[in-house]
Amino acid sequence: GFEGVALKKAWAIAKTESNGRPMAYNGNRNTGDSSYGIFQINMLGNLGIDRKEKFELKSNILLFDPVINAEITYYMTQGGNDWSSWPSYNSGKMKEWLGKFPS
């Protein structure tokens, strides 16, 4: 799983995306979202089809399981090394949480 700096970034992304809530859902299709869980994995359109197949998900509801959500996020970020698919990383919004990581 996530370790060191990657763990801090993962925590900050989760806090920014969902405030750490495993049952968070953003279904705003106007903004291109159908995002699930703690890391807000987007399943809209072809993204969802590809991700369901790649991660053997029978239903998007499984993404509300924080362990499954984190495992998929770990894979998608190449072990926490590439967060470029997360707008909160690209915009820098997650930085406000980096300094608040629990010690």
Give short role names for the model-derived ranges.
Residues 1-20:
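Export/targeting segments at the very N-terminus of extracytoplasmic proteins
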Residues 9-12, 23-103:
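Catalytic and binding regions of secreted/periplasmic enzymes and modules that target cell-wall glycans
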